[in-house]
Amino acid sequence: MSETTTFNKSFILIGLIALFVIPELNNVHYDPQPQFWAEMTVAWAILGLFSFILWRSRERICIPFVVLPLGLLALYLCLQPLILANIDFPGLNYVSALELLLCIFLAISISTIKNTYGLRYMLTSLSYALLIGAILQTLIGFIQYTGTTSYFGDMIFYDSSHPTTNIFGHFGQRNHYAHYLSWGTFGLIYLYQQRRLSAKLFYPLLLWMSFSLTISASRSVFIYFAIALIFSGSFYFNKRNHESKRLFCLIACATIALFAFEYFYPLIHKLFTAHNNFSSGLGRIDSESGTGRRGVEWDKAWLVFKSYPIFGYGWNGYAKQSVLLHPLFPNAALNSGLFTNCHNLILQLLAETGLIGAGIVIFGIIYAIYRLLRRSASVESVILLCMIGTTLSHSLNEYPLWYMYFLAGLVTFLAMDKPLAIIGVNKLRALATIPIIACAYLMVSGSIIFDTLVNYYDTPDDQATFTKQAKYLQNIVDHNPLWAYFAIYTLDNYINVDSDTTNKLYSLPTQYYYTHKLNTFHPYPDTMTKEAMLDWKLGNHDAAIAMVKLDLIAFPVYKSSFKDTLKDPQYKELYQLVK
């Protein structure tokens, strides 16, 4: 890069904070895509960091290996709609491909920084960013835990309807919160290992992080720290030097602290809050089997893969198959919502992208990890393995990599291997300028569209405004593939069967067309009922009956809601099915 090293390093740290701290602090969660603004912030941070690296570098840019699987998967997702006829919303393939393109930009940026200033500098800067972010999230989590969110107005995101599961920072999910705090804890350990923090600061912070992980009530943290113990223990027994011993002891200390807080949590709980609704990860392990519902979804994903082994059923196509296959599992736990993801990265990829997509990802990750370790394991590579292990083990039980802020983290970790290639900066500038401008344009225009979708999500009362907004949404569904799904998700609110405002705007066949289009992609319980009602009114009685029966089998917890929706005498036969 340029000669002004101090300026470069300061901007790089700011860039990492913009990437790993600011998006995660987002407290705005609006339908039709609650994490939109957090993910958009990640995208802008990546674009800014890549542009800075590209135009501050004097000579060479480094290309890490992880760029290859990212590029191949992006290409395959773009080609999949041409190969498979059953992809209802190809724009979602293109959006994911654009996200992977941004990840390529990020990987190149991280590799170039690491190759310029060294792995230790890169990981130190990353650890500072993750620690800052984790501390801020724990403060938010503590406010949620103590029930004092009312003092902060809308600044703190809070779900008052779930008093035992709302300790999730600004992630909205406790396992995502614990995942991020685990990254921060490993960053804290690395900074102390490198003597960047004093013992007076390290140990109180370690205890605070352990407490925060405990009140999140995530069971996955035990897996994360068990994996970290295995990695650091193997490193110590292979090296048997002071550095490896110190790292192993620190991770063991963190693990013991976590178990201590988990075990004594019922006593600690009384110090901070008066309510008796509490749980911890250890308590949840003792009281729940935990994987029963996920196991059914894993079985479904495997069945989908067996039916579509090469190309997969189609990107984002699992949700439909999950509902259609549900009758095969009569003893499954009750579903309170639609599973759009089977909660396992490998099975999800096998089901939706087949051996081609899954092979690209699995081989890419394994070989990237191998490249991190193939010369000689170091403290830095072990810390990176701990962070990677956290993300991958979480991905075997949920879907964190479907969020840009976690995907960006994994790409960052994997991009710290030895560069696969080094190219002249002028060549990359020529190649990247148009994609950068195109991404920026799509991000600006997409933000405007999303803001409009949020404003239009709740239907207005007057017919003129209702018609205007519905026509806007309909136009996006019909002509903007990148936003068609989110627009039809919003338009669904405007299609209310037997409503005068809807009937004045759309004929029954038109109502059916858009309801069916959404329902064949993401069969939500209320949308299935709506399609059944429209089928009935159009004279397709057998289809209506079949749809209600499937709805009842897949979502029995909503039986009372179905009865309320179908109580009109004209749907008497459908109503009888849910009595």
Predicted regions and their residues:
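Transmembrane alpha-helices of multi-pass inner-membrane enzymes
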Residues: 228-230, 379-431
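Short aromatic-rich membrane-water interface segments that cap or initiate transmembrane helices
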Residues: 29-31, 87-99, 161-175, 285-290, ...
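TM-adjacent membrane-interface loops and short helices in multi-pass inner/ER membrane proteins
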Residues: 173, 295-339, 353-360
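Transmembrane signal-anchor hairpin modules in multi-pass inner-membrane enzymes, especially those
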Residues: 1-95, 101-131, 191-200, 243-246, ...
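A membrane-periplasm/extracellular boundary helix in multi-pass inner-membrane enzymes
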Residues: 239-285, 433-452
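TPR repeat positional signature
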Residues: 487-490, 528
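Hydrophobic transmembrane alpha-helices and their immediate junctions
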Residues: 355-383, 547
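Alpha-helical transmembrane segments of multi-pass inner-membrane proteins
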Residues: 11-26, 42-53, 74, 78-81, ...
